[in-house]
Amino acid sequence: MKKIVLAVAVLLSLAACTEKSEQMKELAQMSLRQSLGNGQVKIIGISEPDSTFGTNYMRPDEKKAIIANMNRVTDVIMKRTKNMSVFNPEDSYTIALAERQMRANNDLRSMLYDSDTKGEWSGWKVKIDFEAKDGHNLDYRAERWFFLDKEGNVIFKTMEFPLP
């Protein structure tokens, strides 16, 4: 009898975790759609909620992936401008990509300098890769990180990095 009660308790806790995980992912998606406001968002992928230990804490593999993506974005900009020797002010795509990268650099610096110190558990993070249209109706790709409270009910910080 004890084994049956224990098995039911384990199954219920697994179901509750799965339900909470889905709720956090839905909250992040809703926040993304509302923040972009244009309704033309295509979700490419959503990570499972992961523990976070501060608002800038990233695991080493996450930092490495973000830096690699930012390097690829830089490569795209350099290729389109021939290493900045041929700048075309009419090239809206390159200008918009460079603007998104410059905005992301502040979060990147904070993440690199502050994320090595793993603090106390502060909640959850969810990453969404997506495609959307910017204010100039240009297609772009990005990843946005959502930092949620311990209960997974409130998003208290986001970071967005462009994707090439």
Tell me the role of every PLM-derived stretch.
Residues 4-14:
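Sec-dependent N-terminal signal peptides
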Residues 17-164:
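Cystatin/cathelin-like cysteine-protease inhibitor module
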